[in-house]
Protein backbone atom coordinates (compact mmCIF):
# COMPACT_ATOMS: atom_id res chain seq x y z
CA UNK A 1 0.00 0.00 0.00
CA UNK A 2 2.75 2.45 0.94
CA UNK A 3 4.46 1.88 -2.41
CA UNK A 4 1.37 2.83 -4.39
CA UNK A 5 0.66 5.84 -2.20
CA UNK A 6 4.22 6.99 -2.90
CA UNK A 7 3.68 6.64 -6.65
CA UNK A 8 0.44 8.62 -6.48
CA UNK A 9 2.31 11.32 -4.57
CA UNK A 10 5.00 11.47 -7.27
CA UNK A 11 2.39 12.29 -9.88
CA UNK A 12 2.03 8.94 -11.65
CA UNK A 13 -1.19 8.83 -13.65
CA UNK A 14 -1.01 5.18 -14.69
CA UNK A 15 0.05 2.07 -12.78
CA UNK A 16 1.21 -1.34 -13.98
CA UNK A 17 0.42 -4.46 -11.98
CA UNK A 18 1.72 -7.96 -12.57
CA UNK A 19 -1.01 -10.60 -12.62
CA UNK A 20 -1.26 -14.33 -13.21
CA UNK A 21 1.28 -15.32 -10.57
CA UNK A 22 -0.98 -15.83 -7.54
CA UNK A 23 -4.52 -16.84 -6.70
CA UNK A 24 -7.05 -15.08 -8.93
CA UNK A 25 -9.24 -13.88 -6.07
CA UNK A 26 -6.23 -12.57 -4.16
CA UNK A 27 -4.99 -10.61 -7.16
CA UNK A 28 -8.46 -9.19 -7.76
CA UNK A 29 -8.56 -7.95 -4.17
CA UNK A 30 -5.19 -6.26 -4.72
CA UNK A 31 -6.52 -4.49 -7.81
CA UNK A 32 -9.68 -3.43 -5.97
CA UNK A 33 -7.56 -1.99 -3.14
CA UNK A 34 -5.52 0.09 -5.60
CA UNK A 35 -8.67 1.33 -7.31
CA UNK A 36 -10.03 2.39 -3.91
CA UNK A 37 -6.78 4.18 -3.02
CA UNK A 38 -6.87 6.17 -6.25
CA UNK A 39 -10.65 6.67 -6.09
CA UNK A 40 -10.81 5.05 -9.51
CA UNK A 41 -8.98 7.96 -11.12
CA UNK A 42 -5.76 6.12 -12.04
CA UNK A 43 -5.94 3.76 -15.04
CA UNK A 44 -4.35 0.39 -14.39
CA UNK A 45 -2.28 -1.73 -16.75
CA UNK A 46 -2.21 -5.45 -16.00
CA UNK A 47 0.73 -7.50 -17.25
CA UNK A 48 0.59 -11.29 -17.33
CA UNK A 49 3.82 -11.91 -19.27
CA UNK A 50 2.13 -14.57 -21.40
CA UNK A 51 1.36 -16.90 -18.48
CA UNK A 52 -2.37 -17.46 -19.01
CA UNK A 53 -4.54 -19.83 -20.97
CA UNK A 54 -7.75 -18.86 -22.76
CA UNK A 55 -10.04 -19.51 -19.78
CA UNK A 56 -7.96 -17.45 -17.35
CA UNK A 57 -7.57 -14.64 -19.87
CA UNK A 58 -11.34 -14.52 -20.33
CA UNK A 59 -11.83 -14.45 -16.57
CA UNK A 60 -9.49 -11.49 -16.22
CA UNK A 61 -11.17 -9.68 -19.10
CA UNK A 62 -14.51 -10.07 -17.33
CA UNK A 63 -13.06 -8.65 -14.12
CA UNK A 64 -11.21 -5.83 -15.88
CA UNK A 65 -14.38 -4.72 -17.65
CA UNK A 66 -15.68 -3.50 -14.28
CA UNK A 67 -12.52 -1.59 -13.32
CA UNK A 68 -10.57 1.43 -14.64
CA UNK A 69 -8.22 -0.85 -16.60
CA UNK A 70 -6.37 0.70 -19.52
CA UNK A 71 -5.33 -2.65 -21.00
CA UNK A 72 -4.19 -6.17 -20.16
CA UNK A 73 -0.69 -6.79 -21.47
CA UNK A 74 0.26 -10.08 -23.16
CA UNK A 75 -2.05 -12.42 -21.21
CA UNK A 76 -1.19 -15.38 -23.45
CA UNK A 77 2.10 -16.55 -24.91
CA UNK A 78 3.62 -15.42 -28.18
CA UNK A 79 1.97 -17.43 -30.94
CA UNK A 80 -1.50 -17.08 -29.39
CA UNK A 81 -2.23 -13.65 -30.84
CA UNK A 82 -5.27 -14.69 -32.88
CA UNK A 83 -6.80 -16.35 -29.82
CA UNK A 84 -6.21 -13.16 -27.83
CA UNK A 85 -7.78 -11.08 -30.58
CA UNK A 86 -10.87 -13.30 -30.60
CA UNK A 87 -11.28 -12.96 -26.82
CA UNK A 88 -10.81 -9.19 -26.91
CA UNK A 89 -13.73 -8.72 -29.32
CA UNK A 90 -16.16 -9.67 -26.54
CA UNK A 91 -14.98 -7.06 -24.03
CA UNK A 92 -14.47 -3.29 -23.81
CA UNK A 93 -10.97 -3.70 -22.32
CA UNK A 94 -8.07 -3.64 -24.77
CA UNK A 95 -5.33 -6.24 -24.97
CA UNK A 96 -1.73 -5.21 -25.58
CA UNK A 97 1.01 -7.19 -27.30
CA UNK A 98 4.42 -7.07 -25.61
CA UNK A 99 6.51 -10.21 -26.08
CA UNK A 100 4.71 -10.72 -29.40
CA UNK A 101 6.15 -7.47 -30.82
CA UNK A 102 9.59 -7.22 -29.21
CA UNK A 103 11.33 -7.04 -32.56
CA UNK A 104 10.63 -4.93 -35.61
CA UNK A 105 9.66 -7.85 -37.86
CA UNK A 106 7.05 -8.95 -35.30
CA UNK A 107 5.69 -5.42 -35.00
CA UNK A 108 5.38 -5.22 -38.79
CA UNK A 109 3.60 -8.58 -38.92
CA UNK A 110 0.88 -7.59 -36.48
CA UNK A 111 0.63 -4.07 -37.80
CA UNK A 112 0.01 -5.50 -41.28
CA UNK A 113 -2.54 -7.89 -39.73
CA UNK A 114 -4.26 -4.86 -38.16
CA UNK A 115 -4.06 -5.90 -34.52
CA UNK A 116 -6.91 -4.01 -32.87
CA UNK A 117 -5.31 -3.50 -29.47
CA UNK A 118 -2.17 -1.83 -28.17
CA UNK A 119 1.46 -2.38 -29.14
CA UNK A 120 4.07 -2.23 -26.35
CA UNK A 121 7.22 -1.03 -28.11
CA UNK A 122 10.68 -1.42 -26.57
CA UNK A 123 12.99 0.77 -28.67
CA UNK A 124 16.20 -0.55 -27.12
CA UNK A 125 15.67 -4.07 -28.50
CA UNK A 126 13.31 -3.53 -31.45
CA UNK A 127 15.95 -2.99 -34.12
CA UNK A 128 16.89 -0.19 -36.50
CA UNK A 129 15.90 3.21 -35.13
CA UNK A 130 14.84 4.68 -38.47
CA UNK A 131 13.01 1.53 -39.56
CA UNK A 132 11.14 1.53 -36.25
CA UNK A 133 10.17 5.18 -36.66
CA UNK A 134 8.94 4.43 -40.18
CA UNK A 135 6.80 1.55 -38.90
CA UNK A 136 5.41 3.59 -36.02
CA UNK A 137 4.32 6.25 -38.49
CA UNK A 138 1.71 3.79 -39.78
CA UNK A 139 0.11 3.17 -36.38
CA UNK A 140 -2.64 5.19 -34.68
CA UNK A 141 -1.32 7.37 -31.86
CA UNK A 142 -3.39 5.65 -29.18
CA UNK A 143 -2.21 2.16 -30.18
CA UNK A 144 1.40 2.62 -29.01
CA UNK A 145 2.99 2.44 -25.57
CA UNK A 146 6.75 2.79 -25.29
CA UNK A 147 8.39 0.69 -22.60
CA UNK A 148 11.70 0.05 -20.93
CA UNK A 149 13.57 -3.19 -21.59
CA UNK A 150 15.52 -2.74 -18.33
CA UNK A 151 18.27 -0.80 -20.05
CA UNK A 152 20.55 1.58 -18.14
CA UNK A 153 19.60 5.23 -17.85
CA UNK A 154 21.79 5.98 -20.88
CA UNK A 155 19.84 3.42 -22.88
CA UNK A 156 16.58 4.77 -21.54
CA UNK A 157 17.50 8.27 -22.71
CA UNK A 158 17.95 6.97 -26.27
CA UNK A 159 14.62 5.13 -26.09
CA UNK A 160 12.87 8.23 -24.79
CA UNK A 161 14.33 10.39 -27.54
CA UNK A 162 12.84 7.98 -30.09
CA UNK A 163 9.47 8.18 -28.34
CA UNK A 164 9.58 11.96 -28.56
CA UNK A 165 10.60 11.88 -32.21
CA UNK A 166 7.81 9.44 -33.08
CA UNK A 167 5.09 11.76 -31.83
CA UNK A 168 3.14 8.80 -30.39
CA UNK A 169 2.56 10.33 -26.97
CA UNK A 170 -1.10 9.70 -26.17
CA UNK A 171 -0.52 6.97 -23.58
CA UNK A 172 1.74 7.15 -20.53
CA UNK A 173 5.15 5.56 -21.15
CA UNK A 174 6.28 2.45 -19.32
CA UNK A 175 9.65 3.62 -18.02
CA UNK A 176 8.99 3.53 -14.28
CA UNK A 177 12.08 1.40 -13.58
CA UNK A 178 14.51 4.06 -12.41
CA UNK A 179 14.72 2.62 -8.89
CA UNK A 180 16.43 -0.47 -10.33
CA UNK A 181 19.41 1.59 -11.45
CA UNK A 182 20.22 3.75 -8.45
CA UNK A 183 23.63 2.07 -8.21
CA UNK A 184 24.48 3.40 -11.67
CA UNK A 185 25.13 6.75 -10.05
CA UNK A 186 22.55 8.44 -12.27
CA UNK A 187 18.80 8.56 -12.06
CA UNK A 188 15.82 10.45 -13.40
CA UNK A 189 12.54 11.08 -11.61
CA UNK A 190 10.51 10.08 -14.64
CA UNK A 191 7.05 9.57 -13.17
CA UNK A 192 5.11 12.76 -13.92
CA UNK A 193 7.17 13.35 -17.08
CA UNK A 194 6.05 10.12 -18.73
CA UNK A 195 2.30 10.62 -18.54
CA UNK A 196 -0.13 11.13 -21.44
CA UNK A 197 0.94 14.21 -23.41
CA UNK A 198 3.87 14.59 -21.01
CA UNK A 199 6.70 14.43 -23.54
CA UNK A 200 6.95 17.93 -24.85
CA UNK A 201 10.26 18.04 -26.72
CA UNK A 202 13.86 16.93 -26.63
CA UNK A 203 14.65 20.23 -24.90
CA UNK A 204 12.30 19.29 -22.06
CA UNK A 205 14.02 15.93 -21.75
CA UNK A 206 17.49 17.46 -21.67
CA UNK A 207 16.40 19.63 -18.73
CA UNK A 208 15.99 16.48 -16.63
CA UNK A 209 19.69 15.57 -16.76
Model regions: which residues?
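Metal-dependent enolase-superfamily TIM-barrel catalytic cores that perform enediolate-based chemistry
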Residues: 1-91
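Short, low-complexity, polar/charged sequence segments that are solvent-exposed and flexible
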Residues: 7-10, 34-36, 64-66, 114-116, ...
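Hydrophobic faces of well-ordered beta-strands that scaffold small-molecule active sites
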Residues: 13-17, 42-48, 72-73, 93-98, ...
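Active-site beta-loop-alpha junctions enriched in small/polar residues
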Residues: 18-22, 47-53, 75-79, 98-102, ...
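Short amphipathic alpha-helical patches
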Residues: 27-31, 57, 84-88, 95, ...
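Catalytic cores of alpha/beta
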Residues: 54-64, 103-115, 129-138, 152-168
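A beta-strand-loop signature enriched in Asp, Gly, Thr, and Trp
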Residues: 75-77, 82-145
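Flexible C-terminal active-site loop/helix
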Residues: 149-209
